[in-house]
């Protein structure tokens, strides 16, 4: 099955690089997981403001999109710890298309080729104007800053541990977005991902909100935000809900921190986020709490947080706009008189899955990454992480407190 996926990835990439038909392209850089940017509309004739003009050809555009990320890693820990050793795999291989239409309409369809069966990641219809936007279909809900950032633009191989542990993901529903100056708010009503919409009677339902303020002061750009999530799991999560996270890698199935199966009926998540960029430097931090509500049992509360800082060794900067970090455009790319963009990042990553009589473990992670972006569509990442566990889900010779070291490299190409 893996061979079939690799063959599909290679064939698709070869077609898009060498044989794809001519398509319309936008000059505006767009983070891969952002909603679709619409082409500029023609300005009406000032002398006849009420006259209607035919839609221009630029109002209809179709753009293929794809990415491939390949990871190679080594995981070490105490003797006898499962999951250690050398690892390599395709992290992501996605192919999709963006369609922009007249009257502010747009659509996106994208698939992930590495899953079995192949899954849809984005599948939605969008309408927008200068301040408002409505999205219908499978999409990113109102998520933490680290998850809102495209996986093409994150600082490390994976996002913060709480993002995967608390189950932040794409879901099916309808959302509304409003922007006014430096302030924005968005909210949505959702159910499960498309692949799980097999029985309406057992589907979960949720309400999600996110707001942020992103002012500019002198030469520094700031971001302050908050988010809220309420979810009724219905029959979806009864006696099967687990909160757990992998060790700073997605290409391993081993998890050293995780709760037992819990009979969760509803859950709430609260989050705070902050970030700033000034020239070559950036900082970002988030804190999130998850409260799991159970029938006739104590309601545990779990916590996750991270803080990171980064600096470019070249004359580049990390864009912070629209409530997320955008793609890096090297000031002097390879082939354009330079070496591309080189960035160094440090992060502290904390996850606490202990609450009352529930012991899921604690993780304190210390991570460093070096990222080389020779051109906008290419990236090479190197990462080292030391993860310190206590009350770990997996014991080694009866010991549940130990450290794991993770060394990983990722090659990435996108279009």
Question: What residues fall within each predicted segment?
Answer:
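Intrinsic disorder/low-complexity detector
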Residues: 7, 29-30, 34-35, 47, ...
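General helical secondary-structure elements
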Residues: 1, 9, 21, 37, ...
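Domain-scale selection of a single, long terminal region
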Residues: 1-13, 204-210, 217-236, 261-293, ...
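Outer-membrane beta-barrel pore domains
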Residues: 27-38, 57, 81-82, 239-415
């Amino acid at each position: 099955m893996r061979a079939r996926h690799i063959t599909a990835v290679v064939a698709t990439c070869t077609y898009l690089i060498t044989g794809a038909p001519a398509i319309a392209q936008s000059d505006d850089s767009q983070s891969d997981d952002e909603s679709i940017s619409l082409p500029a509309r023609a300005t009406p004739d000032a002398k006849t403001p009420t006259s209607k003009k035919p839609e221009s050809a630029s109002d209809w555009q179709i753009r293929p999109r794809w990415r491939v990320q390949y990871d190679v890693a080594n995981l070490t820990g105490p003797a006898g710890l499962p999951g250690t050793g050398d690892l390599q795999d395709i992290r992501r291989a996605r192919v999709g298309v963006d369609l922009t239409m007249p009257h502010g309409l747009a659509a996106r369809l994208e698939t992930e080729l590495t899953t079995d069966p192949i899954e849809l990641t984005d599948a939605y219809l969008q309408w927008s104007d200068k301040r408002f936007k409505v999205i219908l279909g499978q999409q990113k809900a109102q998520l933490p800053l680290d998850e809102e950032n495209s996986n093409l633009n994150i600082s490390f191989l994976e996002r913060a541990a709480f993002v995967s542990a608390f189950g932040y993901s794409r879901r099916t529903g309808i959302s509304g977005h409003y922007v006014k100056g430096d302030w924005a708010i968005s909210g949505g009503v959702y159910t499960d991902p498309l692949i799980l919409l097999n029985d309406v009677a057992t589907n979960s339902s949720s309400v999600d909100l996110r707001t942020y303020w992103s002012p500019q002061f002198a030469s520094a750009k700031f971001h302050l935000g908050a988010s809220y999530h309420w979810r009724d799991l219905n029959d979806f999560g009864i006696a099967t809900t687990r909160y757990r996270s992998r060790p700073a890698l997605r290409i391993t199935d081993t998890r050293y921190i995780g709760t037992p199966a819990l009979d969760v009926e509803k859950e709430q998540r609260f989050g705070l986020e902050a970030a700033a960029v000034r020239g070559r430097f950036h900082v970002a931090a988030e804190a999130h709490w998850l409260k799991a509500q159970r029938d006739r049992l104590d309601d545990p509360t779990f916590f996750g947080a991270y803080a990171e800082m980064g600096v470019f060794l070249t004359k580049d900067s990390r864009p912070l706009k629209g409530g997320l970090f955008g793609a890096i455009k090297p000031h002097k790319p390879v082939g354009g008189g330079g070496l591309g963009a080189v960035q160094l990042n440090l992060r502290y990553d904390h996850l606490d899955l202990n609450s009352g009589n529930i012991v899921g473990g604690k993780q304190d992670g210390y991570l460093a990454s070096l990222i080389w972006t020779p051109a906008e569509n290419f990236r090479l990442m190197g990462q080292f992480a030391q993860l310190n566990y206590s009350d770990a889900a997996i014991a080694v010779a009866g010991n549940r407190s130990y450290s794991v070291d993770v060394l990983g490299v990722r090659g990435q190409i996108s279009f």
